[in-house]
A protein has these predicted regions:
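A nucleotide-sugar donor-handling region in carbohydrate enzymes
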Residues: 139-212, 235-238
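C-terminal amphipathic helix plus adjacent low-complexity
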Residues: 326-364
Length: 364
């Protein structure tokens, strides 16, 4: 008998969607029936990738944070300004989820940092499986990086996902977690990318939709305008009309061409998002990263430098950029050695071994 799985995915940035597409593709090979809980913003992507899978629309609650945890006052202000009844929205989802499998509820709930399906699992006393990369922040050492503490990220995890039947944690870097039956650390959950012959003059720049901080992104672009010895392919949801005059800058929207562009570039300039860093490592691509004011990004950038996978932008100037470019070959060798040392198994095999043992989910 097929297991009925309700899977919910966050839509902030592109990392959650990219990761869940990989997981859904693997689950489709198994003895399961899937229903997806996705937002209006992301449903187009899921519909294009999985037209045969039923989808339930959700609205994701947004919690405002400050450095020591949740900012309840700002969260209240934002909630009032949205003029949407979040509880009513959840109940509408729950009514549909309760009978989403031809009148039957799911057997198992899976979530990638999505709260609606989590609350539903708790209310229905269903097994909840977390499939994300943020859960590692519950277990890694407590510290502060550049004035940003881990308290914010941990507060969100405790607020949304205080308890899980199992946590699969995707991580591009090694993490020392005390062995627990309900936790499995996976090699990064990424798609299989094909590496092409390198174009040494081509650099991909990725601006995550996570931020609208134009001032920060323009700092990066200002640094690039002087480097006419390279061609920069810039992916962004924002328009930068003042920079379109530079012939060595090409602007694109994130889409199908992104995979082709990173397959042959010589390096990537990006925010320190876990998913893209992981994909770059899989292709031996050095990273020059800037960070958003979150502990997760600060920690990812710290790991990039610790293992010599690239460099963090601090000054946004030509001297620092030159230092990065002059060491590309060193970074490539370090990335290759790092991957061979730490990525010794396949994420899908590790995940499915656990799913089979605990829940009877297996490839058909």
């Amino acid at each position: 008998m097929k297991k009925r799985i309700l899977l919910g995915a966050n839509d902030v940035g592109n990392g959650h969607i990219s990761r869940q597409k990989c997981i859904i593709h693997e689950l489709q090979k198994c003895n399961v029936e899937l229903v997806l809980a996705v937002t209006e913003k992301s449903i187009v992507q899921y519909e294009a990738a999985f037209p045969e899978i039923k989808k339930i629309r959700i609205n994701i609650p947004w919690i405002q944070c400050e450095n020591d945890g949740i900012d309840f006052k700002e969260t209240l202000n934002r909630y009032r300004n949205t003029k949407m009844d979040q509880f009513e929205s959840f109940l509408e989802f729950a009514v549909e989820a309760r009978q989403c499998f031809d009148g039957c509820p799911p057997d198992i709930v899976m979530t990638d940092f999505e709260a609606n399906v989590t609350w539903f699992a708790y209310a229905m006393d269903l097994p909840l499986i977390c499939l994300d990369q943020q859960s590692k922040l519950l277990y890694i050492g407590e510290e502060e990086i550049d004035g940003i503490t881990i308290a914010r990220d941990r507060a969100l995890l405790r607020f949304y996902f205080p308890k899980a039947d199992h946590r699969f944690i995707s991580s591009f870097y090694p993490i020392d977690i005390e062995k627990k039956e309900e936790i499995t650390v996976l090699p990064p959950v990424i798609r299989n990318l094909k590496k092409e012959k390198m174009d040494r003059s081509k650099i991909v720049v990725y601006f995550s939709p996570f931020t609208n901080d134009v001032k920060l992104l323009e700092q990066v672009l200002d640094m690039l305008t002087e480097r006419t010895d390279y061609h920069f392919v810039v992916y962004s949801k924002l328009d930068f009309k003042n920079y379109e005059q530079y012939p060595h800058l090409t602007f694109k929207r994130i889409g199908e061409t992104f995979e082709n562009d990173i397959s042959d570039c010589c390096c990537i300039l990006s925010s320190a998002g876990h998913q893209l860093i992981s994909e770059a490592i899989s292709l031996d691509i050095p990273l020059y990263v800037f960070t958003f004011p979150t502990y997760d990004q600060k920690y990812c950038a710290k790991m990039v430098e610790r293992y010599k996978l690239g460099k963090t932008m601090r000054r946004f100037d030509q001297i620092e950029f030159d230092d990065f470019l002059q060491n590309l070959e060193l970074y490539r060798r370090s990335i290759s050695a790092f991957r061979k040392k730490y990525w010794t198994s396949s994420w899908d095999d590790v995940m499915l071994d656990v799913l089979n043992e605990k829940y009877g989910i297996h490839r058909m």
